């Protein structure tokens, strides 16, 4: 299993890491993981910020009920932010089986999506206008059995830049080219 890790910056200028792994020689599949680089720093920042907030409220001689309301609301907001933040996104490509797309959130919550191999029509890097700027997204073209075409966006939460997407695209295109060669023979 060959593995490589490359560091990039996403469209919001946050550091991300792309890890690509080759899976087996018989299947010739691969896995791509894009994750935020400073995951530990946010937890460390939150652990120092919370006690500082408690001490500040105590020294301001706030009413005790206001102290508990501020504390509870701060805890609720902190938990919500931790719960909703995407930690990493993974795309696993196994030829003749399909593409599994996994998004991991805080508190080990995951969402999985699967695209069957027979329904994959292609992969493209799509140019999108978003809030007065142009961003690039990696998209899988899916045709269902009734020949309706739909687009499935990959890495929509970590939002890697074009240079990162091109690396993933080239590997996916190699695998999909093998699919078309095998289906013709």
Which role fits each region the language model picked out?
Residues 54, 74, 97, 118-121, ...:
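Amphipathic alpha-helical interface elements that mediate macromolecular binding in regulatory proteins
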Residues 114, 128-132:
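Extended serine/threonine-enriched, polar tracts that run as long, contiguous segments within proteins
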Residues 59-73:
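Hydrophobic alpha-helical transmembrane segments
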Residues 36-38, 95-98, 103-105, 119, ...:
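Residues that form ligand- and interface-recognition hot spots within folded domains
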Residues 134-185:
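A membrane-cytosol interface segment of integral membrane proteins
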Residues 1-60:
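N-terminal membrane-targeting/pre-transmembrane regions
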Residues 43-49, 111-117, 149-157:
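Short amphipathic beta-strand/extended segments with alternating polar/hydrophobic composition
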Residues 77-124:
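Conserved beta-hairpin
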């Amino acid at each position: 299993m060959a593995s490589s890790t490359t560091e990039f910056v996403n469209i919001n200028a946050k550091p991300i890491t792309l890890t690509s792994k080759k899976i087996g020689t018989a299947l010739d599949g691969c896995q791509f993981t894009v994750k935020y680089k400073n995951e530990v720093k946010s937890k460390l920042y939150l652990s120092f910020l919370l006690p500082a907030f408690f001490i500040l409220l105590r020294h301001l001689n706030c009413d005790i009920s206001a102290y508990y309301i501020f504390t509870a609301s701060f805890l609720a907001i902190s938990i919500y932010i931790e719960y909703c933040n995407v930690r990493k996104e993974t795309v696993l490509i196994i030829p003749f089986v399909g593409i599994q797309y996994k998004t991991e959130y805080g508190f080990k919550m995951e969402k999985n999506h699967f695209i069957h191999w027979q329904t994959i029509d292609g992969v493209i890097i799509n140019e999108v206008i978003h809030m007065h700027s142009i961003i690039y997204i990696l998209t899988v073209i899916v045709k269902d059995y009734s020949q309706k075409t739909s687009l499935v966006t990959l890495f929509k939460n970590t939002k890697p830049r074009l240079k990162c997407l091109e690396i993933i695209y080239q590997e996916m295109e190699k695998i999909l080219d093998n699919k078309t060669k095998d289906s013709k023979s």
